[in-house]
Amino acid sequence: MRKLFENIQLRGEIAVGNIISMNDMKKKEILDILELARKIEDCSEEKKLKFLHGKIIATLFFEPSTRTKMSFESAAMRLGANILSLPPVEQSSVQKGESFTDTIKMVESYSDLIVVRHPLDGAAKLASEISKKPVINAGDGSNQHPSQTLLDLYTILDEKGTLENLKIAFVGDLKYGRTVHSLAKALTHFNPSVMYFVAPQSLQMPEYLLEDLKKNGIKYEILEDFRDCLDKIDIFYMTRIQKERFPDIKDYEKVKGIYVINRENIVGKCKEDMIILHPLPRVDEIETDLDDTKYALYFKQAKNGIPVRQSMMMTVLGKNKEFFDQDTEYKNSQNINYIKNMKCNNSKCISNHENIEVKFIHIKEDSENLNKNNLKKKSKYKCFYCEKVILEDEIKIQ
């Protein structure tokens, strides 16, 4: 993998501060994090222990996690940091009715960096607004999961030698799958040949994300059967149907187990160099008989979370300076004019569960493609927190 980065000139261009959404990251920033991860892997274990010595990393996980939580904590400890972990929610002050906002304010005073996972969309964005300490999003509802995306890209680059011009199929829960949303966005920087979105209609990619792909000139196809693209793709990105995201359990029962891959329907039917990725945990969508095939990279993918998350933590804490030829600068805000006094129509948005002022960003349409008389009607806005795009006539006034 070392040779893959020889042409990348590192200049510390990553904005030190927060890593919340792939929508905020430029191509160069992504590549810098991947390169730093590779450089960290090359360091001795003894040297790594000095990188974050004396730092306290707070891991606030408000929903269940095994890989992501343990990966962040292992990554931090291997860099010499101490861990301050939120106890199970039922044992914390959250159970007593403490707001998310107050929790972040308190934890900020105890730590140097906050890693947060939350079931509500936009929670990490809100945390980054409240905290003067850096925040890393470890997954917010069905919105974003940047650390998973960066380790996905690291794995793809390591295996394929490039991130450019690839064909990828996303299969399973694409509606609620934050890993899919994040990775699809990140890949727009790397000119994918085509993206295939394979899911039942009820679990297809949200329309606002498809519109973003169109805006970026990305070719994609909507499918319901992965066999329609299996012999064409470089990457098979499998996801589980997420029972916990369904408002009605009856809807989950209709689609559970709809996609299952195994030796019989994969081996001999795909490209010889195709790779299978999965953010894990799996349930029954990948049978174990695929685990020892050359296509299965999901366990290696999970292992790659250590150097990538180390890179992320060092970056937001400004501890990446010795790897770059100039200092980075702390940046914790953007100069954007927000529209206020409106209510987000996403019931899972953090703004509908905390006492905060909601902010929207006006999305400017291409006036050449719109009837001037309909400009006002067609106006679109993006919620600052959950990043959902909604039409003007769907907005409610606070």
Where are these regions (language model features)?
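Short cysteine-rich clusters marking metal-coordination/redox-active sites
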Residues: 342-344, 383-386
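Adenosine-phosphate binding glycine-rich loop
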Residues: 273-274, 279-327
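Positively charged, low-complexity intrinsically disordered leader regions
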Residues: 2-70, 74
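Short, flexible, mixed-charge glycine/proline-rich loop motifs
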Residues: 329-341, 360-378
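Cys/His-rich microdomains that often coordinate metals
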Residues: 348-353, 390
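Phosphate/diphosphate ligand-binding glycine-rich loop within oxidoreductases
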Residues: 44, 50-157, 284-287
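Rossmann-like adenosine-cofactor binding region
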Residues: 213-290
